[in-house]
Regions:
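Glycine-rich phosphate/adenosyl-contacting loop at the front of the ribokinase-like
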Residues: 1-68, 73-80, 84, 102, ...
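Conserved phosphate-binding/catalytic region of the ribokinase-like
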Residues: 2-14, 162-165, 212-313
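Residue-level marker for buried hydrophobic side chains located in beta-strands
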Residues: 13-15, 170, 200-201, 226
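Conserved N-terminal subdomain of the carbohydrate kinase-like
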Residues: 33-35, 43, 58-142
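Short, conserved phosphate/pyrophosphate- and ester-handling motifs at nucleotide-, phospho-/glycolipid
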Residues: 56, 203, 265
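Hydrophobic beta-strand scaffold residues
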Residues: 63, 89, 170-171, 226
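Alpha-helix C-terminal capping/helix-to-coil transition sites in glycosyltransferase folds
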Residues: 135-136, 196, 222
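Conserved beta-alpha-beta core of the PfkB/ribokinase-like small-molecule kinase fold
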Residues: 139-217, 233-235, 240-241
Length: 313
């Protein structure tokens, strides 16, 4: 079964956010203080925005990634790898900066802990953006940390305005709770409200941290369609109607054993968005169910394949 319906026209998307070098540490056993343990160290293309863009391109969506990288070997290698996957990369290269690096420690269950050195990824400015990049796009997708800080937050605000002017919908993934909560829950809520997303993606842990409760129902105040990713437990969709509480839709998935879950959430977003674009961005329960099912299938593809090693020059 294909991951989503075959489009009868060109589908376009813009993703704005991080392209970074993932340095993955997968120890064969528990770390021991003051000594070394055997394991595997790998270099991969990273960044939530870049991973979503790559999957969108693989699924047949004409995709542009707007990002910033350093004027260095990792930046050149990352841009080249994404272009090889069919992504149109519009990368600013701020002087004196280095490409972002993310350290990932992967445990035996495949779960990850991160150390983020975002570097150039946070230095995209509004002057770097061009209106033509957004023309014809059906959706602008971004991880929530693209809304944070300066100059990146200003660039993202301009990107949202340009996308709206071009007729695109806005899709936001909370992506990571810690950067949002670092500014305080009230400020984080205001940031998402100001972005006014049409679609809001999150996982169960991020939703609980963002709201301060395990019940995700409150997310429906931030977007008309909310997608809560629960991993092997499936996805919960909250869909606002005409008054009254949001409708709740559960979409099951098949559990998959994975040594590394990196990128599964980004792949889900891409699968969902691709199917949603094919279905003319409709928000009926039937279309949203199809989109979530497509997201599950693409996430399974991400989990079922080894991540490709990045070759540095």
């Amino acid at each position: 079964m294909p991951p989503f319906a075959r489009p009868s026209r060109v589908l376009r998307a813009v993703v704005l956010g991080d392209l970074a070098l993932d340095v993955v540490l997968a120890p064969a056993r528990l770390l021991e203080r003051g000594t070394d343990v055997p394991g595997v160290v790998r270099l991969h293309q990273g960044g939530s925005a870049a991973s979503t863009a790559r999957w969108l391109a693989r699924l047949g969506v004409r995709t542009t990634l707007v990002c910033a990288v350093g004027r260095d070997g990792p930046g050149r290698a990352l841009v080249a790898a994404l272009r090889n996957d069919g992504v149109r990369v519009r990368a600013a290269r701020p002087a004196g900066s280095r490409t972002g690096r993310i350290g990932l420690l992967v445990d035996a269950a495949g779960e990850r802990s991160f150390v983020a050195d975002r570097g150039a990824a946070d230095l995209l400015s509004s002057d770097d953006l061009r209106p033509g990049w957004f023309r014809g796009a059906g959706v602008l997708h971004l991880p929530a940390y693209s809304l944070l800080g300066s100059p990146l937050g200003g660039a993202t605000a301009r990107g949202i305005a340009l996308a709206r002017e071009a007729g695109a919908r806005i899709s936001v993934d909370l992506a990571s709770a810690e950067p949002l909560l670092a500014i305080g829950r009230r400020s984080a809520h205001r940031l998402i409200s100001d972005a006014s997303p049409d679609l809001l993606f999150t996982n169960t842990d991020e939703a609980a941290a963002f709201l301060g409760t395990v019940d995700p129902a409150g997310l429906a105040t931030f977007a008309p369609v909310v997608i809560v990713k629960g991993g092997a437990a499936g996805a919960t969709l909250l869909v606002r109607g005409d008054g009254g509480p949001a409708l709740r839709l559960e979409v099951a998935t098949r559990p998959i054993a994975a040594a590394d879950t990196t990128g599964a959430g980004d792949a889900f977003d891409a699968g969902f968005l691709a199917e949603w674009l094919v279905r003319d961005r409709a928000t009926t329960l039937a279309v949203l169910h199809r989109a979530a099912a497509a997201g599950h299938r693409v996430a399974a593809r991400q989990l079922g394949r080894p991540r490709r090693e990045l070759r540095l020059p």
